[in-house]
Amino acid sequence: MGPEKGSAVIRNTFSLLNGIGEKLERTIWKKKVLTWDDFCASTEIEGISPERKRIYDDQLNQASMELSVGNSEYFARIMKRREHWRLFDVFKDGAVCLDIETNGFQPDHGGYVTVVGLYDGYEWRSLIRGENLTAESLNNALKGYKYLVTFYGAAFDVPFLLRSFPGVRFDIPHFDLCFAARKLEINGGLKKLETLFGIERDDVVKGLNGYDAVKLWEQVKKGNMEARELLLIYNKEDTMNLLKLADILYLRLKNATGIEEFIACGCA
């Protein structure tokens, strides 16, 4: 990944600093301190002690350096997960969308992953139980990506994978579109949001849901190749549509911060 885009909202972000939330961040923007460079160049920031400012200056300089070399794991460690969406623009080219199918049960009650779908904007691929799905193959498939996009993955997909495949690592920032939508007061599952934003699905799987995916797997276990193909198409649509939805929600979240208005006029 090359240097980040100049308009990326991450460089307007102060909520990555300990003790600064969205409210104080907006207060800082109102003082015409809009970027990390603005902050570090200011001799003082109202409401922040000189000692604290020196600490923040060091942290922002470090963040700037890590961003310039594309070290996304650094930001996964220092930022609250609910703010990981702010990194989407800079790491989109290194992002991978992930969606899993299961047999319908939790891991501690006989549950297991049937399919893991991965899409990076260029290629969709699948890891399938009994064929090529292992902790090693999943780690290899995730290797090199800098950013994770899921729908409800923070609560379901990632914990399920971690419980099912010890040794699998998710150390990169995670943009969970379900919680991003809720932040925007848009409720509902993935299919509802796709309909809301006009995102189309392949006709052969239109109307299918997670329970249908469970039933399809039952047929796959019996050797039904048509069911296997349908299950993979269903997962492919789930996974590929995440990137389209991420584009939409990122822009809405960015607009909701008000930063564009602050940048446009340089004031409140």
Language model features with spans:
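N-terminal accessory regions of nucleic-acid-interacting proteins
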Residues: 1-92
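Conserved DEDDh/DEDDy metal-dependent 3′-5′ exonuclease domain
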Residues: 115-200
